[in-house]
Amino acid sequence: MNIYDQLQVVEDRYEELGELLSDPDVVSDTKRFMELSKEEASNRDTVIAYREYKQVLQNIVDAEEMIKESGGDADLEELAKQELKDAKAEKEEYEEKLKILLLPKDPNDDKNIILEIRGAAGGDEAALFAGDLLTMYQKYAEAQGWRFEVMEASMNGVGGFKEVVAMVSGQSVYSKLKYESGAHRVQRVPVTESQGRVHTSTATVLVMPEVEEVEYDIDPKDLRVDIYHASGAGGQNVNKVATAVRIVHLPTNIKVEMQEERTQQKNREKAMKIIRARVADHFAQIAQDEQDAERKSTIGTGDRSERIRTYNFPQNRVTDHRIGLTLQKLDTILSGKLDEVVDALVLYDQTQKLEELNK
C-alpha cells in the first residue's frame, strides 16, 4: 500500500468515526465513546493535512490549465506560472509532513507521566540540581497548561532533593517529556566553594507513562502492603492514626512509600499509581533491551544511566549530547522554556524513523 492509499484509508476511517460518534448507542456507552473520540483526535491532524494536500494538487491542475488557456496573454501566463511554482513547492512540503504524520505513533504519547528526579553523583550539589530540574519541569508544565503534582519528596539538609516523584497530567505529556530520561550533568561553582572552582554533579531523570489499572493488572498476591505512622522532621510520629503506606512488588522488589496525604486511602492510591508505572516500566525495559536494534534507532542508546545533557553555568550553555545540540541559553531553559530542546529532539526522532522506513 503506497502513502496515498494509506492516507485515503485514514480519511475514510475518520469520516466513519464522525458518524459513529453521533450514534446514540455509542454516545450512551461511555467507554466506547471515549475510545472512538481518542482515535478520531489522533487522526485529525493527518486528515486535515491530507485534505489540504489534495487542494494543493488541484491548484497544480488549475494552474497548468490556466497556462494552456492563456491565449498569448503574457501577464496571465506569468501569473499562472508563479502559481504553479508555489503549488509545487507546497506539494513537496505537504508530502514530507504527511510522511511524518503517518509514522507509527508511540501508544504512550498521549499519556500522563510519572516523573522521578534523583540527586546522583555530587552529594548536596547534586540534590540542589535535582531541585533546579524539578523547577524547570514545573514551569514548563505550567506553560503547556499541564497539571503538576509532587507526590513524594525526600529532601536533604540544604534544600535540595535526594528524590522527588511528580505526576504530570495533560495533553500529550509523554510525547514531549519522554526524551528527558537519563543522566543530567551540571557544571557550576557550588555556593560552599570558597576557591571558585567549578564542580561537576549529576542528577538522574526517569519519565514513565502513567499506567491505568485496566491496562496493567498487578496480582494482589504479588504485593505486600505495610501501614505505619507518618514521620515528620527528626523522625517523630506526626499522626496518631497510621496513614503512611509502603507497597512492595515481591517479584521485582520494587518499593514505594507514601505519606504525603492525610489519609491512608489517598496514600495507598498514590502509591499504587507509582508502583504500577514502575513495574510496567521495569518489564517494558526488559522487553526493549531484547530489541536493542530498535532501541538504537531512536534517540541515544536508551540506557537509563546514559549522560544525555550537560548544563554549564559559567558558559550559560546547555548541550544535548544525543543530537549534538548546543544552546547558550541555560538561564532561559532552566526557567522552563524547553520548547527549543524538545522540538529538536522530536524532529531528530522523526528523521531517524523516516530513514529507517526508507531503508
Curated annotation (Swiss-Prot):
<comment type="function">
    <text>Peptide chain release factor 1 directs the termination of translation in response to the peptide chain termination codons UAG and UAA.</text>
</comment>
<dbReference type="Pfam" id="PF00472">
    <property type="entry name" value="RF-1"/>
</dbReference>
<feature type="modified residue" description="N5-methylglutamine">
    <location>
        <position position="236"/>
    </location>
</feature>
<dbReference type="Pfam" id="PF03462">
    <property type="entry name" value="PCRF"/>
</dbReference>
<dbReference type="GO" id="GO:0016149">
    <property type="term" value="F:translation release factor activity, codon specific"/>
</dbReference>
<dbReference type="InterPro" id="IPR000352">
    <property type="entry name" value="Pep_chain_release_fac_I"/>
</dbReference>
<dbReference type="InterPro" id="IPR050057">
    <property type="entry name" value="Prokaryotic/Mito_RF"/>
</dbReference>
<comment type="similarity">
    <text>Belongs to the prokaryotic/mitochondrial release factor family.</text>
</comment>
<dbReference type="InterPro" id="IPR004373">
    <property type="entry name" value="RF-1"/>
</dbReference>
<protein>
    <recommendedName>
        <fullName>Peptide chain release factor 1</fullName>
    </recommendedName>
</protein>
<dbReference type="InterPro" id="IPR005139">
    <property type="entry name" value="PCRF"/>
</dbReference>
<keyword id="KW-0963">Cytoplasm</keyword>
<dbReference type="InterPro" id="IPR045853">
    <property type="entry name" value="Pep_chain_release_fac_I_sf"/>
</dbReference>
<keyword id="KW-0488">Methylation</keyword>
<keyword id="KW-0648">Protein biosynthesis</keyword>
<dbReference type="GO" id="GO:0005737">
    <property type="term" value="C:cytoplasm"/>
</dbReference>
